A protein has these predicted regions:
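Divalent metal-dependent phosphate-bond-processing catalytic cores, especially two-metal-ion Mg2+/Mn2+ enzymes
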Residues: 2-129
């Protein structure tokens, strides 16, 4: 691709990733992933999903085994945003933080999501420094 075309493709991809965060907040995860609220609330997070997240990679679909993995996977889209303005928008709009305010009855999952929020705050701050 020429540089101009690549620029437009990256802008569209960034916008799509940001919109995916919005959709996953506005539409109940139970509806998107065809899972019961009970299954979602007791869901663990797959260790391989956490490994990919902490390596700052987008989580591959093939790694996801549990419903909570989808929220982690969507949050990991932030690592592939191309432009500083996209990162600023993600933080400002708040969809990411609302997605990560994941309601769970599983204490290990609650701890994982707290750590994920902390890591994303740290990572976003480092990107804007």
């Amino acid at each position: 691709l020429d540089d101009r075309t690549r620029l437009f493709c990256q802008i569209l991809r960034d916008a799509d990733k940001i919109d995916i965060l919005r959709v996953n907040v506005e539409t109940p995860m139970e509806e998107i992933y065809n899972v019961s609220t009970a299954a979602l609330r007791r869901s663990p997070v797959t260790p391989a999903v956490l490994d990919a997240f902490y390596a700052h990679h987008c989580v591959l679909h093939s790694l996801k085994q549990y419903p909570a993995d989808n929220a982690v996977g969507h949050a990991s889209l932030v690592f592939e945003l191309c432009y500083p303005e996209s990162l600023r928008i993600v933080d400002e709009q708040g969809w990411l933080w609302r997605l990560l305010d994941f309601k769970t009855d599983n204490p290990d999952t609650a701890a994982a999501f707290a750590a994920i929020r902390d890591e994303l705050h740290r990572w976003l701050n480092a990107q804007s420094a």
